[in-house]
Amino acid sequence: MITIRLKDGKEKEFESAVSLADAAKAISNSLGKNALVAKVNGELTDLRDPIVDGAEVEFFTKEDPEGLFTLRHTASHVMAQAIQHLFPGVKFAIGPAIDDGFYYDLDSDHVFSQEDFTAIEKEMSKIAKENIPLVKKVLPRDEALQYFKDKGQDYKVMLIEDLPEEETISLYEQGDFTDLCAGPHMKSTGKVKTFKLMTVAGAYWRGDSKNKMLQRIYATAFFSKEDLDHYLFVRAEAEKRDHRKLGKQLDLFSFHEEGPGFPFFHPKGMILRNKLMDYERELFKEFGYVEIMTPVILSKKLWLQSGHWDHYKENMYFTQIDDEDYAIKPMNCPGGILFFKTQQRSYRDLPMRVGEFGLVHRHELKGALHGLFRVRCFTQDDAHIFMTQEQMKDEVIKCMAMYQKMYGVFGLEYHVELSTRPENSMGSDELWEISTNALREAIETAGVPYQINEGDGAFYGPKLDFHVQDSLGRTWQCGTIQMDMQLPERFDVNYIGEDGEKHRAVMLHRAGYGSLERFIGILIEHYAGAFPTWIAPVQAKIIPVTDKNLEYAKSVAAAMSESDIRVEVEEANETLGYKIRKAQMEKVPYMIIVGDQEMKGHTISVRSRKNGDLGSQSLPMFVANLIREIKEREN
């Protein structure tokens, strides 16, 4: 008998090693009909594969991300088959499913463009209608090599040659198209009905600029037209909201070839940064933090002791001072530890919550840089909490309460993932278990739903990752709460207990925004540049109808500035319509229009970005309402 264990803990017995598809059918007719793929002992597995005795098995349908991944993987093969029909002689490299679709890398004399997409999509639809079965074949290494050599598919030959000798080599055949692939795939091409080719880009073979440049066609696929239409809408909206474009339009920041990946913040961008830091400093005060600042450059000895030299060296920048090796800090933690150790701490000092807006530098490949989302230097709103083991759970709960406030003020919902021990980690199993359990107990006590993200913890400890959801429904990993019992061991971080003896402290790393730069990029796209009044770089724009109203406009601005309202006067000698359109492009929360009538009555005419024309008001009344809106941080 062969026994498998299902997700709900129940066991199912079979007389022989039936396929996963047959196993699903035996469990229930509904599952047999709807299952598309399975996980066997955590590995995504094709339903054609046989069950394994003692394995943990979980099935997935089109309602699951794993089901969509499988559809897109098959769609990449359908696209490749269509291209083979239309452009004979194309050599195929790799064609994986990715987060929002799939792609295929091609070597062809034909230069692909979007003009080819209609013909390719038409051929794909034809292949889908034929509902061609996908047949999985496992071949001996030599036979697989010879097959692709005979077909002239050089890249497939190289891929096989790179595989370990003991690796199982599988091919998927669909009609006249056969591809080297580990799977998983749909049963047939019939489900690949809703798709769209998106763009063409260049991609070096194996990502190495020394190799040949291939052509990469990006595409996407969904189970329904509604899902595809929604994806295309979000994508189009995201292009309008691109923080790189809006950053330039709103004069917030810039990048220069003299420093790729190193952002330059302009005066208006600095207002955004400072307002975000001011808000977190208020939270520091509310939740009992002190603030420090530590150096940007520290000795190699420190990074050897911390473990960063062994585990993070490829992401660091280095220099020499007085013939000694130094590194520009990629993380703030060792500096925080040195601060803690400047005095002998007592249990009465704990928990000690130490915050820092620390500038860190991490090396990123030039091709990976992406506006404020992927940079080489950024500010982390880091904090390190030093505590006893008994305080771990309560401190994690307090951090989560802080994040609830932090994200709530921006109208950002979030979900949480518990990221566990990665392969490249340090420390004993016992300490990892204690740390992971502390995070799990805290989040369960707080009643916050969470998912497990296996193997994605930091090298020194497990963590909770907070993924915020923006106005387009996209998620961004921002906050972290990382438990660390490793660095306190390495640095002998201790405190004097009630018994008068030294005890090892526990260290918790937390960052709410994560990267201040990245969070600003997220907010730009979340709000489409139309920031809430309290963080808007310019809160009101005074627009004189004609030049003779300019002095009155300046007096209104001066009065508002006295109440710490950020205000600008539009002094351009242009038409009123032009000046209003310009303020709209700048996405200013309030336009204040002053003409002869307003001068005569000592009033202002107010237009709200949110609520339209608010009519004539007295300046004191408008200022009072605006101050209230700013103070309450209306979103």
Show the residue positions of the predicted features.
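NTP/phosphate- and nucleic-acid-binding module
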Residues: 1-91, 98-635
